Swiss-Prot record:
UniProt xrefs under PANTHER family: 30S RIBOSOMAL PROTEIN S18, SMALL RIBOSOMAL SUBUNIT PROTEIN BS18A
Keyword Cell cycle: no
Designated name of the protein: Small ribosomal subunit protein bS18
Coiled-coil segments: none
GO terms, biological process: translation
Organism expressing this protein natively: Mycobacterium leprae (strain TN)
InterPro entries the UniProt entry points to: Ribosomal_bS18, Ribosomal_bS18_CS, Ribosomal_bS18_sf
Gene name, Swiss-Prot/TrEMBL: rpsR
Cellular compartments per GO CC: cytosolic small ribosomal subunit
PROSITE patterns found in the cross-reference section: RIBOSOMAL_S18
SS bond partners: none
Length: 84
């Protein structure tokens, strides 16, 4: 006879409600020249972090992506990381 392979369901964790930083601070603007702000949304490999990681809303995540791409074109941010 085969063993029963029923698994116990994982306990449900309450969903952590994250607020968009830019929605919380109404006066904070996303600018491609602000590299210190944009570097917080870029991984070590040079990729733009996902919205589920950063916790931003859809509109502000799009604005960040556009600002990062503009900063890369103007050579304020690298396209890839320098560490290999």
């Amino acid at each position: 006879m085969a063993k029963s392979t029923k698994r116990r369901p994982a306990p449900e964790k309450p969903a952590k409600a994250r607020k968009c930083v830019f929605c919380a601070k109404k006066n904070q603007q996303i600018d491609y020249k602000d590299t210190t702000l944009l570097r917080t949304y870029i991984s070590e490999r040079g990729k733009i972090r996902a919205r589920r990681v950063t916790g931003n809303c859809v509109q502000h995540q799009r604005d960040i992506a556009i600002a990062v791409k503009n900063a890369r074109e103007v050579a304020l941010l690298p396209f890839t990381s320098s560490a290999r």
